[in-house]
């Protein structure tokens, strides 16, 4: 491959990594927000059984959403790591060509 091809590869991988990191940050923020919402649910001691069930269900829904976001974030972290490996390999080839 030529120097230009390696440079294009490195640039494309840099862009992909930046995009994935942006998505990961958004998912991390969403997960933290869902956990905060779950933690802020309060149940009065005088609440009816139906209210208690409703609040617990609401808390479970928030925690499920947080766990889903954490899982998606972990998947993106793996993709970022793979892209970084490819980018580093392309950068090494580029340095050898120069």
Predicted regions and their residues:
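General helical structural elements
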Residues: 12, 28, 63, 88-91
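Extended, low-aromatic, Leu/Ala- and acidic/polar-enriched alpha-helical coiled-coil segments
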Residues: 56, 60-63, 67-70
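General helical secondary-structure elements
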Residues: 4, 19-20, 32, 49, ...
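Extended alpha-helical coiled-coil "stalk/arm" regions
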Residues: 23-59
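Long, charged amphipathic alpha-helices with heptad-repeat/coiled-coil character
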Residues: 10, 70-98
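Short, charge/polar-rich alpha-helical segments
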Residues: 1-29, 68-74, 78
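Residue-level detector of intrinsically disordered, flexible termini
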Residues: 1, 46-49, 65-68, 76, ...
């Amino acid at each position: 491959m030529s120097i230009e091809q390696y440079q294009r590869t490195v640039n494309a991988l840099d862009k992909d990594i930046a995009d994935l990191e942006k998505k990961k940050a958004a998912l991390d923020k969403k997960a933290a927000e869902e956990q905060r919402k779950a933690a802020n649910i309060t149940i009065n001691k005088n609440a009816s059984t139906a209210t208690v069930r409703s609040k617990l269900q609401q808390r479970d829904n928030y925690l499920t959403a947080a766990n889903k976001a954490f899982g998606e974030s972990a998947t993106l972290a793996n993709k970022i790591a793979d892209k970084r490996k490819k980018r580093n390999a392309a950068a090494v080839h580029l340095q050898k060509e120069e």
